C-alpha cells in the first residue's frame, strides 16, 4: 500500500507492479548512461591515441548498444511511470469519493462543496503528476550520484573534491526555496477553491442571477477571486522558478572550476585529456540529475500541500456509524422520540431541538406544523439518522435507530425533501432511483397515487422524456409529484413528506393524500407543511415552536385549545376553504 501523510491509501497490485518496473527500468538505464563516458574515455585514450581503428569501432558499437538499450528502457520507464501515476490518482479519487458517500450531513457541513470538488480533481492531479513525471529523476539521481561519484574519485580525487563542494551549496539553495514556496502552494490551492465556489454558485443559481440582473455583480465577484488566484500563483511560481537559475549558476561555476584545475593537472602530466572529458561527462550527468531532482522536490512540495488537503477529507471522523448496529431491520414503522435534544455543533450554546418527546403508531399519518425556523426538517432528519440526536433516543419499532444498520434503516424510510432533486436522464430512470427492480405495473401505480399520470401524457416522450439537469424540463409541482412517486416505489415503512406538496394545488394535494391513505394504509406517513389544509386530516398534528413540542392533537382539538394553531388557522383561512 501507499501511505499518504498518515492516511492509508491502497494501490492495486498492478499499479505496484508498474511502479517497480518503472524504477527497475530507470536504474538500469542510468547505469547504461554512466557506462558511456567510461567507454568514451577508453576509446579516446587507447583507440584514438594509438590509431587503432578496430578498437574504435568496437568501442563505438558498445556505446551505440548502450544508447539503444537506454532509449528502450527510457521509453519503458516513462510508460510504467505514467501508468503508476494515473493508477494512484484514480485510487485516491476513488477513496475520497467512497469516503464522501459515508459522510453524514454534519461531516459534509465541515467542507464547502467547491472545496471538495477541488480536492477530488486539482489536488489529486498534483499528486498524480508528481508521481508520473517525478519518478524518473527521483530514481535516476541516487544511482547517478553513487555510481558517478565513485568513478569520479577513481579518475581524480582532486577534481572530485571540487565537485563535492558544490553539493552542499545546491542543497542549501533548494531548502531555502522549498521553505518559502511550501506555504504559498497551500494558499494557491485555497484560492482555487474560491474560484470553483464562485463558478459553482453562479451556475447553480444562474436563473436567479438572470432574474435579478446581477450578471455584472457576479462578473465583478469572479474577477476578484480570479485576481486573487493569479496573485497567489504568481507568488508561488515566482519563488519556484528561482530554482533552475540558482542550480545552473552553481553548475556552471563547478564546470569552470573543474576545467581550470583540470587544465593545470593536464599540463603537469597528472591527468589525461580523455580522463578530463570523462570526468566532465560524469559531472554534467550528476549535476543535471540533481537539477531535475530539485524540480521533483518542488513538485513534491506542491503535492504535499495537496495531500494534506486530501487527508483532511480521508481522516474526517464519521460521526454517524454502524458501531452499535445489530442484524435487524424495520418491521412496522412505529416511531418514538424520547426526550430528544439536538444541536448541529457540539460547541453551540443553544439547542435546535429541546426535550422533544412523542409517539407515532405504525400506519398513522402525522402532521408537523410550525413557523419557519421551528426545526421541523431537523426533527425528521433524526429518524433516518441524517443527523444523530445530541441527547435522548429516537426509536423505531421500540428499538434505538442506532441499533439498525444504516442501509436497512434508510431502506425502510423514504424522505421527500423540501428541495426536490431530479437527476439528468429520463423520467423513468429517475423513478428507478426509488426501486431499480420496479415493474411497470408498480411504476404506473406509484405515478397514479402521486398524480404524475395527470401530466404524463403531456410530456413529449412520456416516461422517456429527459428531465434535464436538476429537472429543469418540468415544473416545480410536477417535480414534487415525481419525487413522491419515486419515494412510494421504495415501498418504505415510513414516508416523510417535508413540505413536498408546496408547489401543488390543493385539489391535487387532496388526491395524493387520499391515494396514500387508501393504497398504503400500513405505511407510517409524516407530513411537514406550512398549510393547515395539508395536515388537517392527519391522525395527530405536532406543533413545533422554537424547537419544542408546543402541542399534539387532532385538528379539532388544537383548533379549540391551542393558540399557535389558532393563529396559523386564522392567518390562512381568509379566502381559503380549510
Task: Report the location of each language-model feature.
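Helix-loop-helix
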Residues: 52-58, 151-165, 235-309, 313-314
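Single conserved hydrophobic/aromatic residue that forms the stacking wall/gate
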Residues: 1-6, 11
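Short intracellular "coupling" helices and adjacent cytoplasmic loop segments at the cytosolic face
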Residues: 50-51, 86, 94-118, 122-124, ...
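Transmembrane helix-loop-helix hairpins at lipid-water interfaces of multipass membrane proteins
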Residues: 19-76, 80, 153-158, 269-273
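An intracellular "coupling" helix at the cytosolic face of ABC transporter transmembrane type-1 domains
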Residues: 16-17, 102-106, 122-131, 135, ...
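Hydrophobic alpha-helical transmembrane segments of ABC transporter permease domains
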Residues: 24, 32, 36, 73, ...
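Hydrophobic beta-strand positions within the nucleotide-binding domains of ABC ATPases
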Residues: 9-10, 120, 293, 416, ...
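ABC-type nucleotide-binding domain
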Residues: 328-578
Amino acid at each position: 500500500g501507499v501511505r499518504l501523510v498518515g492516511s492509508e491509501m491502497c494501490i492495486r497490485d498492478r499499479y505496484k507492479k508498474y511502479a517497480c518496473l518503472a524504477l527497475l527500468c530507470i536504474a538500469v538505464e542510468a547505469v547504461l548512461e554512466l557506462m558511456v563516458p567510461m567507454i568514451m574515455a577508453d576509446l579516446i585514450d587507447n583507440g584514438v591515441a594509438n590509431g587503432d581503428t578496430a578498437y574504435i569501432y568496437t568501442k563505438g558499437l558498445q556505446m551505440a548498444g548502450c544508447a539503444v538499450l537506454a532509449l528502450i528502457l527510457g521509453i519503458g520507464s516513462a510508460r510504467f511511470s505514467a501508468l503508476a501515476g494515473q493508477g494512484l490518482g484514480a485510487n485516491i479519487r476513488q477513496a475520497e469519493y467512497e469516503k464522501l458517500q459515508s459522510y453524514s450531513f454534519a461531516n459534509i457541513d465541515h467542507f464547502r462543496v467547491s472545496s471538495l470538488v477541488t480536492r477530488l480533481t486539482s489536488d489529486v492531479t498534483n499528486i498524480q503528476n508528481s508521481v508520473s513525471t517525478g519518478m524518473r529523476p527521483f530514481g535516476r539521481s541516487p544511482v547517478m550520484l553513487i555510481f558517478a561519484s565513485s568513478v569520479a574519485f577513481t579518475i581524480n580525487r582532486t577534481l572530485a573534491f571540487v565537485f563535492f563542494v558544490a553539493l552542499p551549496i545546491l542543497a542549501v539553495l533548494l531548502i531555502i526555496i522549498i521553505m518559502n514556496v511550501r506555504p504559498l502552494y497551500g494558499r494557491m490551492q485555497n484560492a482555487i477553491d474560491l474560484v470553483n465556489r464562485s463558478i459553482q454558485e453562479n451556475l447553480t443559481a444562474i436563473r436567479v442571477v438572470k432574474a435579478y440582473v446581477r450578471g455584472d455583480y457576479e462578473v465583478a465577484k469572479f474577477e476578484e477571486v480570479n485576481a486573487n488566484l493569479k496573485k497567489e500563483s504568481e507568488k508561488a511560481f515566482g519563488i519556484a522558478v528561482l530554482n533552475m537559475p540558482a542550480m545552473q549558476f552553481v553548475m556552471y561555476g563547478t564546470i569552470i572550476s573543474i576545467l581550470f584545475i583540470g587544465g593545470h593537472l593536464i599540463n603537469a602530466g597528472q591527468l589525461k585529456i580523455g580522463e578530463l572529458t570523462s570526468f566532465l561527462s560524469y559531472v554534467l550527468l550528476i549535476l543535471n540529475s540533481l537539477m531535475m531532482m530539485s524540480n521533483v522536490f518542488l513538485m513534491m512540495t506542491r503535492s504535499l500541500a495537496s495531500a494534506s488537503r486530501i487527508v483532511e477529507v480521508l481522516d474526517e471522523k464519521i460521526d454517524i456509524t454502524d458501531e452499535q448496529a445489530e442484524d435487524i431491520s424495520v418491521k412496522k414503522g412505529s416511531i418514538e422520540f424520547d426526550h430528544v435534544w439536538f444541536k448541529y455543533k457540539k460547541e453551540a450554546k443553544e439547542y435546535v431541538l429541546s426535550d422533544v418527546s412523542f409517539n407515532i403508531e405504525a400506519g398513522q399519518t402525522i402532521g408537523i406544523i410550525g413557523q419557519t425556523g421551528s426545526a421541523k426538517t431537523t426533527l425528521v432528519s433524526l429518524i433516518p439518522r441524517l443527523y444523530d440526536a445530541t441527547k435522548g433516543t429516537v426509536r423505531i419499532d421500540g428499538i434505538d435507530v442506532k441499533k439498525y444498520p444504516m442501509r436497512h434503516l434508510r431502506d425502510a424510510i423514504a424522505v421527500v425533501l423540501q428541495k426536490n432533486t431530479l437527476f439528468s436522464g429520463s423520467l423513468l430512470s429517475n423513478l428507478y432511483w426509488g426501486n431499480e427492480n420496479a415493474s411497470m405495473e408498480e411504476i404506473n401505480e406509484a405515478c397514479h397515487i402521486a398524480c404524475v399520470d395527470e401530466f404524463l401524457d403531456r410530456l413529449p416522450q412520456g416516461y422517456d422524456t429527459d428531465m434535464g439537469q436538476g429537472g429543469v424540463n418540468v415544473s416545480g409541482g410536477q417535480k414534487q409529484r415525481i419525487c413522491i412517486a419515486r419515494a412510494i416505489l421504495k415501498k418504505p415503512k415510513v414516508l416523510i413528506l417535508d413540505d413536498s406538496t408546496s408547489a401543488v394545488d390543493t385539489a391535487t394535494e387532496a388526491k395524493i393524500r387520499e391515494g396514500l391513505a387508501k393504497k398504503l394504509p400500513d405505511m407510517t406517513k409524516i407530513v411537514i407543511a406550512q398549510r393547515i389544509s395539508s395536515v388537517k386530516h392527519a391522525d395527530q398534528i405536532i406543533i413545533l415552536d422554537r424547537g419544542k413540542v408546543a402541542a399534539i392533537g387532532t385538528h379539532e382539538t388544537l383548533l379549540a385549545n391551542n393558540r399557535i394553531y389558532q393563529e396559523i388557522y386564522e392567518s390562512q383561512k381568509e379566502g381559503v376553504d380549510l
